[in-house]
Design a protein with these regions (language model features):
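Helix-adjacent hinge/juxtasegments
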Residues: 56, 61-85, 89-91
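Short N-terminal helix-initiation segments at or just after the protein's N-terminus
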Residues: 14-17, 36-51, 80-92
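A generic structural signal for nonpolar/aromatic side chains embedded in well-ordered alpha-helices
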Residues: 17-18, 65-66, 119
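Broad gene-expression machinery/nucleic-acid interaction feature
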Residues: 23, 36-38, 71, 95, ...
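Extreme N-terminal tail/first-helix region
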Residues: 1-20
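Short gly/pro-enriched beta-turn/loop segments at secondary-structure junctions
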Residues: 19-21, 69, 135-138
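Short beta-strand segments
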Residues: 21-58, 74
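Charged, gly/pro-rich active-site loop segments
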Residues: 2-3, 79-159
Length: 159
């Protein structure tokens, strides 16, 4: 990371950033062509390994691509605000972000139910429980982060 002064390595702060983000941007490759989508997500962190859970219709281009090539990149960001100055060239933007690469695994059974509950917990602060019938109506996949980094530019008063 070029700007090491902005790198976030504290696991608690990384979790805080992830919790503040509501959209993960998922990048994949379809026969040499990049394809990028914004998705809502839930997440889990077990022994320092992050998984991000997404749901989808049971068919479509995204799923076709992921089944052929499960390698992905992802990005999420939050806490955005303009760092305004009188001179335009001195303006900037405050942010917090998490980026990484990983692979997709399609979920079923209990793992799928847990992922859907995680998604609702993150997006709506609810502890919904899902039935097998409800879960059957959607496809659910986990983005398993193989590499992950976090970065932030915060106002001086917040440092």
């Amino acid at each position: 990371m070029r700007r090491s002064d902005r790198e976030i390595t504290d696991p608690g702060e990384i979790l805080s950033i992830i919790n503040d983000c509501k959209v993960i941007h998922l990048a994949m490759v379809d026969d040499g062509e990049p394809y990028l989508l914004p998705l809502n997500f839930g997440y889990a962190c077990e022994s320092g390994a992050f998984s991000f859970f997404c749901h989808s219709a049971r068919e479509g281009r995204k799923l076709d691509i992921l089944r052929k090539n499960p390698t992905v990149a992802f990005e999420m960001d939050c806490r955005g605000a303009l760092d305004e100055h009188d001179v335009a060239c001195h303006c900037g933007y405050y942010f917090a972000s998490v980026t990484g690469v990983g692979h997709v695994e399609f979920l079923d059974g209990e793992e799928k139910l847990v992922a859907l509950t995680s998604l609702m917990r993150h997006m709506a602060s609810r502890e919904d429980q899902f039935t097998e019938q409800q879960a059957h109506a959607v496809e659910v996949f986990a983005i398993r982060a193989d590499k992950l980094s976090a970065k932030a530019k915060v106002p001086h008063s917040a440092q």
